[in-house]
């Protein structure tokens, strides 16, 4: 009995220490499983189970330490925007469970989408209405553009139209936020060391938008796909040039930014190559090599 009490106390303390950016790793693992699925279903479900485990830890913190979670989200725009990855990860995980529990998975998927929009509305009220440029970070992309994960996963539930509407909403928000975040990074405001790894998020929104576009938009534009892919790869290269400096920093929870952005970049490129093959456009073999390299980097 004493051992049980000690164990429960340790578990309680461990859950208390789970940081909000854990949701980012949760999302990265869920997406990585889908990236690795063509190579190994075992790896896919290993990633899915690991992601779900992190989700249980974070959900437990929400239930057991609601005031701490409230303080984290109310007091820090980075944590508040990063928390959206929790709902993005749930959308991804619903594609794992759909073959086994289709109705429940679809209900949870809808719930995650609604929760993300609710978080978006609250974030706008809490941080955007009276925002200051120095408080703007790439995590803002997560709050507003991250909803496009619904577009990426929509085909699983045969909701292409809904996915297309959400894509256009998220892509419009991306165009606005890209200018805002870029202005912030070009401004004189210094970036604190713990927030520097967040720069990696820069590579995610364009690739996520492209993946959502390819998944749901019925009348696709080849020109738009090519332009989006070129921009996505350009942003990815820009992030890679900063990696040597970022990896020299001591560990921060913001290292979670190294996960999903790399995965979605590889996924978007692979989907682009697949689409070009479908419409009988010759794809340079070098692109397949790049997909392989980006998959390795994401892993």
For each of these PLM feature ranges, what is it?
Residues 9-60:
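N-terminal signal-anchor module of multipass membrane proteins
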Residues 28-34, 52-61, 181-184, 208-299:
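C-terminal transmembrane-bundle signature of multipass membrane proteins
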Residues 9-31, 66-92, 109, 125-152, ...:
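Juxtamembrane helix-loop boundaries in multi-pass membrane proteins
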Residues 54-65, 112-123, 174-181, 237-240:
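Membrane-water interface of transmembrane alpha-helices
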Residues 34-41, 94-106, 123-130, 152-162:
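Membrane-water interface regions at transmembrane-helix termini and the short interhelical loops
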Residues 111, 140-243:
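Generic multipass alpha-helical transmembrane bundles of integral membrane proteins
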Residues 43-56, 102-117, 161-176, 223-233, ...:
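Structural signature of hydrophobic alpha-helical transmembrane segments
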């Amino acid at each position: 009995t004493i051992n049980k009490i000690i164990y429960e106390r340790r578990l309680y303390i461990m859950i208390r220490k789970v940081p909000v950016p854990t949701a980012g790793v949760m999302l990265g693992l869920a997406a990585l499983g889908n990236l690795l699925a063509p190579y190994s279903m075992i790896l896919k479900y290993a990633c899915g189970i690991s992601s779900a485990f992190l989700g249980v830890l974070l959900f437990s913190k929400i239930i057991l330490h609601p005031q701490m979670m409230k303080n984290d989200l109310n007091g820090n725009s980075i944590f508040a925007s990063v928390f959206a990855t929790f709902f993005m990860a749930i959308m991804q995980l619903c594609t794992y469970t759909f073959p086994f529990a289709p109705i429940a998975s679809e209900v949870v998927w809808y719930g995650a989408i609604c929760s993300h929009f609710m978080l978006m509305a609250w974030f706008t009220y809490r941080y955007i209405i009276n925002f200051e440029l120095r408080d703007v970070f790439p995590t803002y992309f997560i709050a507003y553009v991250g909803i496009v994960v619904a577009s990426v996963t929509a085909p699983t539930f045969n909701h292409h139209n809904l996915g297309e509407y959400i894509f256009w909403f998220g892509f419009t928000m991306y165009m606005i936020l890209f200018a805002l975040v870029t202005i912030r990074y070009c401004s004189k405001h210094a970036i604190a060391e713990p927030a520097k790894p967040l720069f990696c998020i820069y590579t995610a929104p364009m690739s996520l938008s492209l993946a959502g576009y390819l998944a749901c938009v019925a009348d696709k534009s080849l020109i738009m796909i090519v332009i989006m892919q070129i921009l996505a790869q350009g942003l990815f290269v820009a992030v890679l040039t900063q990696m040597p400096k970022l990896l020299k920093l001591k560990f921060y929870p913001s290292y979670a930014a190294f996960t999903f952005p790399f995965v979605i970049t590889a996924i978007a490129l692979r989907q682009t190559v697949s689409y070009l093959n479908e419409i009988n456009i010759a794809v340079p073999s070098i692109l397949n090599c790049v997909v392989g390299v980006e998959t390795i980097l994401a892993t």
